[in-house]
Amino acid sequence: MVMSVINWFEDRQKFGGLIGAFLEEATRSSMTNERDRRISVNANKGLWARCDNCGNMLYVKFLKQNRSVCEECGYHLSMSSMERIELLIDPNTWIPLDEDMSARDILSFSDEDSYETRILLSQEKTGLTDAVQTGIGYLNGTLIALGVMDFHFMGGSMGSVVGEKITRLIEYATQRLLPLVLICASGGARMQEGTLSLMQMAKISSVLQLYQVQNKLLYISVLTYPTTGGVTASFGMLGDIIIAEPKAYIAFAGKRVIEQTLRQKIPDGFQAAESLFDNGLLDLIVPRNLLKGVLSEISGLYLSVPYNKN
Amino acid sequence: MASAVLPQSNSLTSAKCSLVSPSRNSNLNKVGVEASGEFLRLQSSKNGVNQSLHFGLVLRVGQEDGRGCRKPRKTTAMLKKGGRKTPDKEYPWPQKMKPEDLMGSPLRFLSRFKPLPQKPKPVHLPFELPLVDIQKKIQEVRELANSTGMDFSIQLNELQEKYDEVRRDLYSQLSPVQRLSVARHPNRPTCLDHVLNITDKWLELHGDRAGYDDPAIITGIGQIEGMSFMFIGHQKGRNTKENIYRNFAMPTPNGYRKALRMMQHAAHHGFPILTFVDTPGAYAGIQAEERGQGEAIARNLREMFGLRVPIITTVIGEGGSGGALAIGCCDKMLMLENSVYYVASPEACAAILWKTAAAAPQATEALKITAHELVKLDVVDEIIPEPLGGAHSDPLTTSMNMKTVIMKHMRELLKMEPDPLLAQRVAKFRKIGSYQEGVKVDPRFKRNMKPRDAPMEMGEPKLLPSHVHQNLELSLKTASTAATTSE
């Protein structure tokens, strides 16, 4: 089936645009799931995606089935937050929190566009209210609190809404004694909210102090491509266990900033997950297809501690 | 002096000598050989310098000086013996101490931060040009008065009044861009300048006990009004040489770990913590990343909310993002009038959002980084006034103003018990942030958010009223009742 579709694709070049249009229509109607259609249309305006690592053409439908991992080289392509929730949470157990929270233009910030316009455009384009989805659900039978950041919304930048949603999630987990998993993907702090974004780092770290240190609960952070700036310098690196995806870009200062400071070229793979692992900054590198199992095994190990007398 | 051919010596040495290359062997025969135990010492006939032959490897290869004798290169050993002495590391105490010196507090001999030998050159910021012109005119009139002997005092007084008026006008209405340039002024008093002005005694402590003493962060114990406090701050240099030594107040992970060690030490013993923020940001370098710059900052952020002593942070210059926040999670945040606190430097922000670094002034206006704007956003608790002309024109008055405000807040915080103090610190940061909720959102804007698919039996997740606030109210109530009953 795959081979014939590839042949069709090649033939499309020969026969021209009209048959190409027909092809999309034909395959589009065969997709039963409403969601699938939206996502495939969003992804590169077509049915094919290109792997960033090996340059291979990947059929989007099969790519999604394979959890956005390239079949040829195993490279982990970016994954939307909805897909990540479906990857980790057992079906029919998800309860989202604070779905309707959205950002406010407190500083009346306006660069080329006003901040308000940018928020509305991003919400329209990505179908997300802000850069994080939080909620609770069962992971292999254990109820966990899960927060997933999404890089598609304004580069995953952390503003007041991200700070507030994650803080409320951690407070809920503290009250209900749930393990916490935060999946991080961010370009840094949201500059349009100024110093308020900076204080979100402190806010989340303060509730993590109550959660981890005073209440001794388990927090696992999963760092995905890319995790930079304020998130690395706050909750990303505070997990009891820090897991990274293979070849994820994890940094505090961006590559360009370091090159400007030092005026020299940075070696390749400098801020990749493997390099951080060698420098002792991560606990584990876990591929996506094993992630759910590993998370449930880890929480099982922490629940069966025999000497809980402290 | 045995002029023995080397292979004839005992088996131990011969085994080692065989490693020496044949070309050098011929030369070695011409110098004296003294076999002594484990290794041979080759003594040049010229000047008695030893060239040790460890396991057959010649360590120093000198040049032949024509007569076939090898001339050894000067080694450090040689320097120490005869000729020029290598200078000792400079110590902060005088070489020869007089008995009078030992009378007062010995702590002043331990501080390496001495006043600069020359007064720093005055630097004029771009917006101060009118003042510079008037100053020049005053100078000209004075010279004229001196050279001709005529009385120009009326003109001088007029010019002086004009100077004061223009200065007052300029400095009472500074724009954010102007305040940023004052915050970055090269002669602005540094952390140690302020600390030495406000403390009666000062003892600087060093090191992160794990490999490095970062000069960009200053830690130490100081005494004000008979009470000891722990001081931590970013230290900029007062001139270019110092700035390079201090790395322009950009700390490495070691600096943050040093600060954390000191803060935990302070909480352990009961020193309240005073921190001073003055940094362009954390150092962005390869080694800093490899050693975990993000992790060091994150750990500081989390641990500061668990320290059971009062913490007051004062921003004395520029507060650069995470690098500043890592020592800035406090009970009370104070800022000097002309200091700034930003999430990203205006230049970086302009380059990213406006796509050109030339838009830095617009970025400065838009980001709302000055003290007055941050008080409105409820991030900063109080502004410390600076004398007219900026802190660099009168450092002592600035330090005294700072001392008054810090001690006022400290006296309030010292009355609190640890648990309500921690709860209040968390509450201070908990309320920062601006969002909207409860407003109906267009379903198109939520189409990629996973809706609820759990059965109704799982219930409705209701967050109980934040237990932080509950604990805070409870502790404040118990504290106040305890106070009233004790009276």
Swiss-Prot record, chain A:
Keywords: ATP-binding, Chloroplast, Fatty acid biosynthesis, Fatty acid metabolism, Lipid biosynthesis, Lipid metabolism, Metal-binding, Nucleotide-binding, Plastid, Transferase, Zinc, Zinc-finger
UniProt xrefs under InterPro entries: AcCoA_carboxyl_beta, Acetyl_CoA_COase_Trfase_b_su, ClpP/crotonase-like_dom_sf, COA_CT_N
SUPFAM superfamilies the UniProt entry points to: ClpP/crotonase
EC class (word): transferase
Cofactor-binding details, from the entry: Binds 1 zinc ion per subunit.
Self-association state and partner proteins as the record states: Acetyl-CoA carboxylase is a heterohexamer composed of biotin carboxyl carrier protein, biotin carboxylase and 2 subunits each of ACCase subunit alpha and ACCase plastid-coded subunit beta (accD).
Family according to the record: Belongs to the AccD/PCCB family.
Protein known as: Acetyl-coenzyme A carboxylase carboxyl transferase subunit beta, chloroplastic
Origin species: Adiantum capillus-veneris
